[in-house]
């Protein structure tokens, strides 16, 4: 490829300012930070540290409106210095001083220049680019300004600065689906006592919840929060992984005291608890077969398969919830689905064990007690564990007849 169109170059320019990896860059003429023709790392692009969340509507217009949030009490009379970069005096190669850099509001934040970029070419073709270091952006306590990120308290900074709370953006956990961390996405009731919350949901979510409570948005409205973040590799100089996931849900789930919200968060926890029981079954079967390596990977594989099979079920169940739903009945139905899935996977694990596991062997459990590990004993523990993890999925005689032998 020798060139790209100006339109495509503009898209890559936005991407570069947002997610460019750290590392050594070309030194820009006139930048006092340059040494030996090189600009040394100042961190990733402006959005690289965020656990980004935006709301997807049915149309582009709806999506734009859902994500335009009045982020401060005095938003009607914003700071006069809050301007997009193209309405300010042209920047030089040097980093702006702390006193004038900002950001002063959403306009300057959304057009933050993490890099100094020069495109080469003409009106019809872009043939090259030079990327140099730009302005650092300290995200500490920007949760009242940046509306599209998950935030969490920073223990190390609170200890260093001897004050609380201090919030930093929290990238998403790329190792698990968004629904498994649903409680971090949805606004939560204030914690008991005077302690500030450990996590803050994105302001776009809080704002839509407020519009729902005040009746601006109807209780039958459905929205699709999409989470996006980037994982960087060695010294943040390379992109390791890009995460993107979305969930369709009714707006009542965004309201902090909503019974539907509680049911959804508890349902995600139900799945986690059931999979923990399945993991223990896999570990106990390994012990029964004579394995002394409790980290053999059997438990991880069993958990991975369980989450894969529960994934579509939870997404469909969540999207089904609405103002006419009975939270208790819906959660009961979910627990029964989880029970059926984990029971089947558990029986498959038991059936796959050989004669050595049927006979079993003596061992010591997690509490230091001597026990006899066998496939039959592991299955009994498994069924008992599921009964405790999923108490609403009560076992009936009909269910027992339908379960695999």
Please provide the spans of the model-predicted regions.
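Short Cys/His-rich metal-coordination motifs, predominantly Zn2+-binding knuckles/fingers
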Residues: 5-8, 120
